[in-house]
Amino acid sequence: MQCIGLHTAFVNNGALRFFTESPMPETTVELIQTGPEDAELIRNLYQYYAYESSDWEQEDVEADGRFYIHDEHLARYWQDPQWSANLLLIDGYIAGFLLIEGSELPGLDALELADLFILKRYRRKGIGRAIASQVLCSGTANWLVRFYDQDEVAQAFWRTVLDNLPRPVHTLELDDDPQLMNYLITHAALH
């Protein structure tokens, strides 16, 4: 079995360009690593992401009508070499984002696929699954995937992705947040 879903076509100006397999064979999907000049764009898209989880996270908006974003945390996506904020474009249109962080859990050497957000218009077409699979299967890094047990949509999505990966997937019991489901995707079997 091999990683499927997206095929790297070329790299141009820091942009990884992927093309999806069916069900949308004519669709161009681009995952582009952003720079600090794109912080406001990511911040704006993050508002939609925060809105979608506000019911089960029980988050309220601030006095300015926006969800809280920790500025120092957001800035790390352009300061820390293991962190990145990536913009998702579909046929040239902004369709979401992918946030990657270096895990800060003690004793765990892994990158974390921290947040994947796709606008509703582009969902249920296999794009999110293809992106997640491609990222988790790329290179030799170990990957951490975490999601809240209460988030039924994320739970269904990640179970589909993780159940079909050609790499070993290990369930982790971590003490930092008991509501989080934790999975480690490794390049090879753990000893």
Q: Where does each model-flagged region fall?
A:
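A short beta-loop-alpha structural element at the N-terminal edge
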Residues: 29-45, 51-55
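Active-site rim helix/loop that mediates acceptor-substrate recognition in acyltransferases
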Residues: 60-85
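Conserved acetyl-CoA binding element of GNAT-fold acetyltransferases
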Residues: 109-120
